[in-house]
Amino acid sequence: SNSQIIGAYREKTPGSEKLSMEANEVLPSGIAHDSRYLKPYALYIDKAEGPHKWDVDGNRYVDYFGGHGALLLGHCHPEVTEAVQSALGAGTQFGANHPREVEWANQVINMVPSVERVRFTSSGTEATLMALRLSRSFTGKTKFIRFKTHFHGWHDHMTTGYANHFDGTATAGVLDNIASNVILVSPQDISEIKSVIASDDDIAAVIVEPTG
């Protein structure tokens, strides 16, 4: 039963429970990322290597999350670790241009045929915010199409229709006139997208989460 599972979980993870209680005193909801809001509490991970993670109580887990999908080579891959250590030895924050950003941009362009130029940002939220602003500036149009449940960050245009408010109404703290310019469509429904585009001449962009 669920109670037996939760009981076994608590028995094996007292360190995570203690840290969770401490976190609730200093972090909103006791977490630093919404995906870690779990009941009765989330695990606290101490180390990781390859496909495995270990919590603060020494329990080992197979990691199917992979750093939100970013760790294609697993945790602590020797070549990645060596490269990071080498880079840290040269400095941590230059506040200036760096040769590797040119090398990196060329690598992205070579890997993605449709890309002509690359703009690096500090987060996915910042990237999608700037992309939508650019699309509106270029087209002179206002609205954009989003797929329900697709995640594109946490700015105001992206909260409606991700985990709730699938009717397009504004989530708490978001202005109604922002939500009204977001058109939500069902994932994988090409006919619905075509219908919206055909019936509304004020569409600046369609945004898609490729892995959604």
Question: What kind of region is each of these model predictions?
Answer:
Residues S1-K47:
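Active-site-adjacent loop/helix segments that line or gate small-molecule/cofactor pockets in enzymes
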Residues S3, V62-F65, A205-T211:
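Short beta-strands and strand-loop turn motifs
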Residues P14-E22, H52-N59, I109-N110:
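Short, hydrophobic/aliphatic alpha-helical segments
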Residues A42-D63:
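Active-site and channel-lining beta-strand-loop segments
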Residues I45-D46, I109-P113, R136-T139, G173-I178, ...:
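Solvent-exposed alpha-helices and their adjacent loops that cap or buttress functional pockets
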Residues R60-K141:
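Glycine-rich loop-to-alpha-helix module at the N-terminal edge of alpha/beta enzyme cores
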Residues S137-M158:
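Conserved PLP-anchoring active-site segment centered on the Schiff-base-forming lysine
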Residues F151-T211:
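PLP-dependent aminotransferase-class I/II
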